[in-house]
C-alpha cells in the first residue's frame, strides 16, 4: 500500500468535523432585519404624527383663506414667520419618514425588483418631490414678506394652499398604495387586511383626483383620503412593531 493510499484511508477513517455556530452568533443573525423593522415602525408612527401637527396647527392659528389680500398676507407672515418655517419642516420631515416606512415594507416583502416595487418607488419619489416643492413655496412666503414683495407673497401662498391636495391624488398617492398593496400580497410582513386596504385606498385616491377636476367635493374627498392615508400608515407601523415583538419573543423561547 502506498503512502497516499494510507493517507486517504486515515482521512476517510477520521470523523467529519461539524462546525456549529455558537448561540450568540445565531441570535445576532436576524438583528439587522429586526433593527430595520423597529426603525421602520418608528418612522411609520412619527411621520403621520408630524403631518397631523402640520395640518392641525394652522387651523388653530387663524390661517388666512385663499384670496386674502397681499397686505394682510404680509402682516400675517411677518407675525407668524415660525409657523411657515415650522410648517415646511413638519410637512417635509413627516412625509420623508412615511416614505422611509414604505421603503422598509418593500425591503421586507422582497418586492423591490418587481413591477409593484418599481411602481411604489416611483410613487415615493413623486410624493417627496411634490411635498418638497410645496414646502419651499410655503417657506418663501415669510421671506418675500420680509422684503415687501407682495407679488411673490401672493403667488407663493396661493400655490402652497390647495394645489397639493389636487395633485397628490392624481399620481403619487395611487402609485404608492397600489405598489405597496400588491407588494404585500402573499407575504407575512403585515396582516392581509393592510394589503387589501392599500389597494382600496389607491382606488379612492383615483376617484378623488378625478372628482376634484370637476367639483369641490372631489377636493374635500382628497383631503379626507389624506387623513385616511395617515391613519393607514400609523396602523400598519403599529402592526409591524407588534409582529416584530412577537417574532422576537418566539425567537427567545426557541433559544
PLM region descriptions:
Residues 2-255:
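Hydrophobic, aromatic-enriched alpha-helical segments typical of multi-pass transmembrane helices
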